[in-house]
């Protein structure tokens, strides 16, 4: 009688564990995608590395210390202005990383 109960419990545990294993996700989670809010789009006049002379000079004047980061010297894209509001340079998405509307750091290029 004890052997029969032990066999039933063992079978139940094996079945339960196999169901949990089958229900668990396989592989890594899908990567998250970056989202750009409309207000965070900017039109960059130039895109420069932080080690370039013009970018380093501007960063020095602003007191910003960066290493190995792309610095984007940008002017914002405006919604007002109709056809004249198109970006003819480098459109990017930036979030909370601008310094006095002169430069933005670590922006992501986007296509409009």
From Swiss-Prot:
Q: Which cysteines are joined by disulfide bonds?
A: 36-93, 43-87, 44-74, 94-107
Provide GO CC annotations from the record: extracellular region; fungal-type cell wall
| Positions annotated with a glycan in the UniProt record | 96
Write down the superkingdom of origin: Eukaryota
Location(s), subcellular: Secreted; Secreted, Cell wall
* Database matches in Pfam families: Hydrophobin (PF01185)
Q: Where is the signal peptide?
A: 1-23
| Keywords, comma-separated and alphabetical | Cell wall, Disulfide bond, Glycoprotein, Secreted, Signal
What does the UniProt induction comment state? A CT-rich motif, which is often found immediately upstream of the transcription start point of highly expressed filamentous fungal genes, is present at the expected position.
Show the coiled coil region(s). Answer: none
Instruction: Tell me the GO molecular function terms.
Output: structural constituent of cell wall
Question: What job does the chain carry out?
Answer: Aerial growth, conidiation, and dispersal of filamentous fungi in the environment rely upon a capability of their secreting small amphipathic proteins called hydrophobins (HPBs) with low sequence identity. Class I can self-assemble into an outermost layer of rodlet bundles on aerial cell surfaces, conferring cellular hydrophobicity that supports fungal growth, development and dispersal; whereas Class II form highly ordered films at water-air interfaces through intermolecular interactions but contribute nothing to the rodlet structure.
What is the similarity comment for this entry?
Belongs to the fungal hydrophobin family.
- Assembly description: Self-assembles to form functional amyloid fibrils called rodlets. Self-assembly into fibrillar rodlets occurs spontaneously at hydrophobic:hydrophilic interfaces and the rodlets further associate laterally to form amphipathic monolayers.
Q: What is this protein called?
A: Class I hydrophobin 7
